[in-house]
Amino acid sequence: MENFQLVLLLIGVIAIIGVLVHGFWSIRKQQPKEYKQSPMADISRERRDAQGFDNDGIGAVRVVKNTQQDDEPETIDDEQRDPLATETVTDAFELSGTPATKVNKTRVEPSLIPQESVFATDMPVQESLFGADEISVAAPVITEQAVRTEPEPRLQPVFKPEPQLEPVELKPDPIVEPAPKQEQTEELGEPRDVLVLHVVAKEGEELSGAELLPCLLTLNFKFGEMNIFHRHEDNAGTGKVLFSMANMVKPGVFDPDNMEQFSTQGVVLFMTLPCYGEALMNFSIMLNSAHQIADDLGGVVLDGGRDEWLESTKQNYIQRIRAQA
């Protein structure tokens, strides 16, 4: 795109230069020869040669010698000497190869012709000069016919009658409601294995219900069937149940309305196999939830046999999950 703009710019500059050159050439071609060759220099030169005066009306200085000047030459200072006269006399001596003839001994004052006569004699010449060179430029005459512009013909709008269309009743398309998603109704059958985790309080302590309830809500547990908390597929508490949490003390239920007065020695998290979704992912969520409850309430995570949770125990649970896959 930039190269294309550059090419257009160069073409535009070349076109402008061509138009300017053509305009100057046309003006030069139409200009008369009298303006190209100025005859003023030749006429002034001829006028000076014939009458002895230049354009300012000053003639050549005449030098007249006196008798006393021949016998006794008078010394003239450089300041009193006329530079124009000296220059003229010097040029005359340098140009003439023959000795100058003697002039009358009487002193003759130089006679100057008034400038008015010079201009009077020159005026006819100038008038004839400009009269010959005067160029009459005919002004363009605008005729009445050129001024008159032809009136544009008025176009009368032509309206064609549009054919009347009969109203057509548009029947709305039937709204097709999306079919509700069919919930997974696949029966898992009887559970073949159960993965259990315990979160118990430290020796001599209990888990407070006032602290347990906000922790469960943060972990997206929802109170539901069998009066226990469940973890569903959706964080909003919808979908299939992934795993559940019950009270470790019989009868193993919770009362959400009286959680502030509730306390227990521990809770139990369990997940049946097979389960909905990915079993390994569900187990990972359950294990992280158990550790979070233990950290918030100051408890300890134990396995299904209430033994200390170790890395080897975790690997054993993973093998049990893969065996049921």
From Swiss-Prot:
The keyword Protease does not apply. Residues 28-325 are cytoplasmic. Signal peptide: none annotated. One of its GO terms (biological process) is FtsZ-dependent cytokinesis. Residues 165-188 are annotated as: Disordered. It is a single-pass type I membrane protein. Pfam families: ZipA_C (PF04354). Residues 1-6 are periplasmic. The chain crosses the membrane at residues 7-27. One of its GO terms (cellular component) is cell division site. It is found in: Cell inner membrane. Essential cell division protein that stabilizes the FtsZ protofilaments by cross-linking them and that serves as a cytoplasmic membrane anchor for the Z ring. Also required for the recruitment to the septal ring of downstream cell division proteins. HAMAP family: ZipA (MF_00509). Belongs to the ZipA family. Interacts with FtsZ via their C-terminal domains. This is Cell division protein ZipA. It comes from Shewanella pealeana (strain ATCC 700345 / ANG-SQ1).
